[in-house]
Amino acid sequence: MEKPLTVLRVSLYHPTLGPSAFANVPPRLQHDTSPLLLGRGQDAHLQLQLPRLSRRHLSLEPYLEKGSALLAFCLKALSRKGCVWVNGLTLRYLEQVPLSTVNRVSFSGIQMLVRVEEGTSLEAFVCYFHVSPSPLIYRPEAEETDEWEGISQGQPPPGSG
C-alpha cells in the first residue's frame, strides 16, 4: 500500500504583475526528496521569469528530523544578490530556516504562503500551487499617535538625571 505524500500547499501573489507572473507554474508538482529549486534558470523545478529573480533563488529542502518518521522542510536562500524573508526572518545567501505548518515568504516582489500537511512517504512530496488575486502578507505600518503630546515638557526624560 502506498504511503500518503507530504503536501505543500503554496499560494503565490505578485503585486504588480498579478497572475501573469505565474503563467508557467503547474497546478501540481510531485518531487522526490532532493531540494526543489525555484528561480528563473533552466535547472529550476519551478521556473519564474521575473527580472529580480536569480537563476537559483531559493530551495525547499526536505529532511528527516532525528527521531521522526515524517519529512520536515527548510527553506534555503540561494541568491547572492537578493534576500528572502521567511516568517519575519531575513535570509541571506545560503542561510536556511525550518518551515512550520504555515509559513509566510517574500522575495523579489513575490509573496508566497506555504502550508505543510504531513504525510508518511519518505520518497517524495507534492506541491499544489494556487495563484492568489490578493496579497498574502500584510506588514502593519507604524501608526502616528498623539501619545507624546500629553507628556509635560518641563520633566526631563527618564534616565537622564
UniProtKB/Swiss-Prot annotation:
Domain FHA per the UniProt entry, residue ranges: 36-91
GO cellular component assignments: cytosolic large ribosomal subunit
The organism's place on the tree of life at top rank: Eukaryota
Molecular function terms, GO-annotated: deubiquitinase activator activity; ribonucleoprotein complex binding
Cysteine pairs bridged by disulfides in the record: none
GO biological process assignments: auditory behavior; cellular response to cAMP; cellular response to Thyroid stimulating hormone; cochlea development; cochlea morphogenesis; craniofacial suture morphogenesis; genitalia development; genitalia morphogenesis
Alphabetical list of Gene3D superfamilies matching this protein: 2.60.200.20
Purpose of the protein: Inhibits TIFA-mediated TRAF6 activation possibly by inducing a conformational change in TIFA.
UniProt xrefs under PANTHER family: TRAF-INTERACTING PROTEIN WITH FHA DOMAIN-CONTAINING PROTEIN A FAMILY MEMBER (PTHR31266), TRAF-INTERACTING PROTEIN WITH FHA DOMAIN-CONTAINING PROTEIN B (PTHR31266:SF3)
Complexes and interactors: Interacts with TIFA.
Name of the protein described by the UniProt record: TRAF-interacting protein with FHA domain-containing protein B
Organism for this UniProt entry: Homo sapiens (Human)
Lineage, uppermost ranks: Eukaryota, Metazoa, Chordata, Craniata, Vertebrata
